[in-house]
Amino acid sequence: MDITVILCTYNRCQSLAKALESLAAQTLPSAVEWEVLVVDNNSKDQTRTVAEDYSRRHPGRFRYLFEPQPGKSHALNAGIRDSHGDIIAFIDDDATAEPTWLQNLTSGLHGNEWAGAGGRIVPAKNISFPRWFPPDEPRLFRTLALFSCGLEPGPLTEPPLGTNMAFRKEMFDRYGGFRTDLGPCPGSEIRGEDTEFGGRILAAGARMRYEPAAIVLHPVSPDRLRKQYFLTWWFDKGRSEFRQFGIPRDATWFVAGVPLSLFRRLARWTLLWILSISPARRFSCRLKVWTLAGQIVESYRHGHSRETVTAS
């Protein structure tokens, strides 16, 4: 088997059907053997019915796997273990892929030059950004699960997002799977399992390629264009960053188990937030404050521990 597409899902049977329909419409050379593995992370809706319907309609192309352990990373790792492909691609259950997505995303991974690849994630519909949104800060688009490094292919210097990425399967054998202390699960929206893995292999010297022609469409609901959504997302991002990187090794002074340097940075960015005149600049500084607050909260919960939770 050449390629396995892993799609993890939880209680999104309606958007799942649209995602699977876009995968059924993929155009790859007839010589390429590929499959879609739907990993159901203990859904309570009609997810299994939808997935098994596609298995019946496209025998040999779609498979269904039930993973009872809550948490997206558990579902991802279960899918990797059950996959048949030498290349593993990932897409989310609320996204749709353009017909040439899989071919463009994986075309450079059949040799040994590239360990993985990532493509563009664009809004499914045109959206109007509010005045407070900083349009010149590409990193903020990640909050909306959007990703672009331009229109030219080339090496990636930052990890792609999980709804449009692929890796040679041997990368998981070499570097481990997705960390199970990261990623959405019931009761927690701490993300980062996708970018942590991509960052892990980039830090190890592996090379990843940006494929702008590999396009995934992702919905951006009005709720995600509200300040509170961004603030919550960046607070959770701070918590995720602390789980990934822990306490800085040069930290020497602590207050209630939290590095004093985090409080200093929090004070500095709070001052910048207060003094900024531009609405976009003010909000950008405010997001940094919320990120640092998330790091402080997570640091307080973990005390002085520098232990890293390994991938399973």
For every predicted segment, state its role:
Residues 100-133:
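Conserved donor NDP-sugar-binding/catalytic core segment of glycosyltransferases
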Residues 67-83:
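Glycine-rich, basic loop-to-helix element that forms the pyrophosphate-binding segment
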Residues 12-26:
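Short, well-formed alpha-helical segments that are part of the catalytic scaffolds
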Residues 22, 40-49, 95:
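A conserved acidic beta->alpha catalytic loop
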Residues 160, 184-197:
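Acidic donor-binding loop at a coil-to-helix junction in glycosyltransferase catalytic cores
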Residues 136-158:
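Short, flexible, basic/aromatic active-site loop/helix in glycosyltransferases
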Residues 88:
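Short aromatic/hydrophobic "clamp" motif used to bind/position activated sugar donors
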Residues 232-239, 246-312:
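Non-catalytic, C-terminal membrane-associated alpha-helical segments of glycosyltransferases
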